């Protein structure tokens, strides 16, 4: 465990977590004066829009393939595409959700920071 100054702490904090999280310092105000950032809020990066977009795209493509295959001699082929796409979407969504959860976000790269008496404790 090592103590470093607040500025270095925040710089290190941002460099480590910015790749994994949306980091927003929670600035408390008292009589309109901004206090030092003693609390840091972590939010998972919003990657769910990409997951939803891929889900819609996959559903559209598999639906198109199904409609084309319905006229084919082997009608089960198109339905297999739909089932496979649905399973892939479920797997990607669950993995993405777990990877971007706040707890994993906070413990990214196994490093943790917090501010104590205007010093940053790093371990």
UniProtKB/Swiss-Prot annotation:
Domain of life, per the record?
A: Viruses
Q: What is this protein called?
A: Uncharacterized protein UL59
Q: Which gene encodes it?
A: UL59
